[in-house]
Amino acid sequence: EGNPSTTSDPTDGSGAWFWWSKEGTKVYKQLWNRLQDKLQDEYGLHNLIYEENLYAWSDSSAEWYVGDDRTDLVAYDKYNTQYNRHDGKTSGPNLDAETGIFYKLNGYVNGTKMVAMAENDYISSMSNMLVEHAYWLYFCPWYDSANALFVSGENYQDHDEMKALYNSDFCITLDELPADLFNHGDQPTTTTTTTSGTTTT
């Protein structure tokens, strides 16, 4: 009870492959707002972190953004081991940091929200993310299945690069979290964080 939980429903708005986005941005935003209001006002769920999945396919992609007051994070689903690569290859691990997409999403929110990689096939290399300043909040490889081994398969991951990322100071792993993480009371410290800095209020 009270533990934070991330939700991204309705997801993939601008993808238009789900029923909730086929009617366009207006209907999608109405559904997002209605669901959020119901979860908070009717069910009393105030521990949810709202994450909106966005894309960067065209100039109109930003129109799907639900607004600063309606989401806490923005995220991107990335699957491009086999296509849309920048290295000319069509298979094998793709270590690209997807910097262009990171900064497009950052621009949609004017630097006011953190940007995550909500789903992905490969994990970007640590060196590429650092050099290109693509500071994804987190990454979440799709699980292994009979169809694709997204985590353990060598066609998707460079396991040496994966180990380097997990062992770097840049990456926070579960064992590095405070043991008393959820025992600091009900009143959080209020801060405003943007790409230009953090202010405590």
Kindly give the residue locations of the regions a language model identified:
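Alpha-helical scaffolding within the catalytic cores
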Residues: 54-66, 96-105, 121-129
